[in-house]
Regions:
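Bacterial Sec-dependent N-terminal signal peptides
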Residues: 1-45
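Alpha-helix termination/capping residues and helix-transition junctions
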Residues: 32, 187-189, 251
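Conserved acidic, small-residue-rich alpha-beta core segments centered on
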Residues: 206-307
Length: 307
């Protein structure tokens, strides 16, 4: 009786094991059958036409400023597609394809939109090349000479009439809170401050906000932002307010400030100037900045180039 019971248990175990493996195979086969149906988008071929289509679609789905560019200078992205598609040939070389795609991107007139390949990187330079530089570093060297102080990318000096001069050349430098405390403490004896951000091509938005926060004692509305929420040219969130908050428990400057700008004040420098413009003791002097606000993204084409 005991052996019979063991035999029954053994048969039951083998039966369950067979059922278990049968279920596993059924699940795997079902998954493999359904997997191709999960791919809903066509992947462009790695051909000149495939890379052209991929690039145009990336911009069409993700670029934010179509409406503004259409009002500003009549950009029609669909017309750009038709015009540049006629320039694509299956026999063209990589360099020829690169030039056509780079020219298409330049239709956006955006300094942040670049095509990057192994042999070259495209850049739209007209946004500053067509404007006067209004910045001569020789004059700056004459004024600063050799007795200026430099820390974390900032050069500063006290000039005649008790005016402080500060030149900040890049928001990519490691500008810390302690650096700003040091600079503003040393310049606190001055009656006014010239903050020069000409030729500052941008960098980190966090540093732009960190610097601007030293010039206000209260929270202030500086603008609005919308986020891209999906594909298409009109997929944006509702505008959300942007506030500048003072740097609490830090040295803050509450005397007059003149911010010097030129066309090469770009990207996060543009955001910095936009914030400073809202402050009551700040005046902006110089050219219209180069723009370039927002957070750039990158995507890859079938041939490995990126945009």
């Amino acid at each position: 009786m005991k052996m019979k019971r063991n035999h029954i248990i053994h048969l039951s175990f083998r039966t369950k094991r067979r059922r278990f493996f049968a279920m596993c195979w059924t699940t795997i086969l079902t998954f493999l059958f359904l997997l191709p149906s999960c791919i809903t988008e066509d992947v462009p071929d790695n051909t000149p036409m495939g890379n052209f289509e991929a690039l145009w679609q990336i911009i069409d789905n993700k670029y934010c400023f179509f409406e503004y560019k259409n009002k500003e200078y009549g950009l029609d992205w669909d017309e750009v597609y038709r015009r540049y598609k006629n320039k694509i040939s299956s026999e063209m070389t990589d360099k020829e394809l690169f030039q056509v795609l780079a020219n298409m991107l330049n239709e956006l007139r955006d300094g942040h939109v670049n095509l990057i390949a192994n042999h070259e990187t495209s850049q739209y330079r007209t946004w500053y090349d067509d404007y006067p530089a209004n910045f001569i570093d020789t004059i700056q060297r004459i004024y600063l000479q050799k007795d200026y102080v430099s820390t974390a990318g900032i050069k500063y000096q006290i000039w005649e009439d008790n005016i402080a001069y500060v030149y900040y050349e890049s928001f990519s430098s490691g500008l810390g809170e302690a650096n700003l405390d040091q600079v503003l403490n040393e310049l606190s004896i001055c009656d006014g401050l010239i903050l020069d951000v000409r030729n500052n091509g941008g960098g980190m938005l966090t540093l732009a906000e960190r610097l601007a926060a030293r010039f206000t004692n209260k929270k202030i509305l500086t603008g609005y932002i919308s986020y891209k929420t999906g594909k298409g040219r009109h997929g944006f969130s509702s505008p959300e307010p942007i506030y500048l908050e003072p740097a609490t428990d830090r040295v803050r400057w509450q005397k007059p400030v003149a911010v010097l700008t030129n066309r090469r004040s770009f990207s996060s420098t543009n955001d910095f100037v936009s914030k400073m413009r809202q402050l009551p003791k700040v005046v902006i002097i110089g050219d219209k900045t180069g723009g370039g606000s927002g957070l750039p993204f990158s995507s890859e084409l079938p041939n490995g180039w990126s945009v």
